[in-house]
């Protein structure tokens, strides 16, 4: 089991293996871009140019995300999974997660027969979704305060 190893081995956690930040760092490290490990533009440029080192890391990352989706799907049976944040603007990401998800189901007939692959899509508002959520929360709070004053 993974019990107790987390502090010593973060790779035991889905939050680590499915971290876009870690994936980008690994790609930049593999490319020798050590001066800016957080350079997402450089990482996705290498992916889109089909750099073999970058692709291997990227495909493993997408496979890990697909596995996480399968695990969640077996519990909640979602109609779709939505990827948000800045990384959701990368169409290659959404395509590869869907690709890895279908590969897993094809290569594991037992799983494939028991579940239908939910579509994985990019969030409508992408990296701005958190801003819309914050604005909505503020508007609700202001409405509540206004209502309280009127009562």
What is each PLM-predicted segment?
Residues 4-151:
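ATP-binding/phosphotransfer module of carbohydrate and carboxylate kinases, centering on a glycine-rich
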């Amino acid at each position: 089991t993974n019990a107790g190893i987390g502090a010593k081995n973060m790779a035991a956690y889905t939050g680590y293996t499915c971290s876009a930040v870690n994936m980008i760092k690994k790609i930049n490290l593999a490319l020798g871009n050590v001066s800016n490990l957080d350079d997402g533009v450089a990482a996705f440029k290498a992916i889109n140019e089909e750099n073999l080192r970058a692709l291997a890391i990227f495909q493993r990352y997408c496979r890990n995300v697909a596995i996480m989706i399968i695990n969640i799907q077996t519990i909640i049976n979602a109609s779709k999974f939505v990827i948000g944040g800045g990384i959701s603007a990368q169409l290659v990401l959404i395509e590869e997660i869907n690709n890895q998800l279908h590969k897993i189901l094809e290569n594991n007939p037992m799983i494939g027969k028991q579940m239908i692959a939910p579509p994985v899509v990019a969030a409508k508002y992408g990296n701005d979704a958190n801003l819309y959520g914050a604005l909505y929360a503020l508007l609700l709070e202001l409405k509540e305060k206004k209502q309280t004053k009127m009562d």
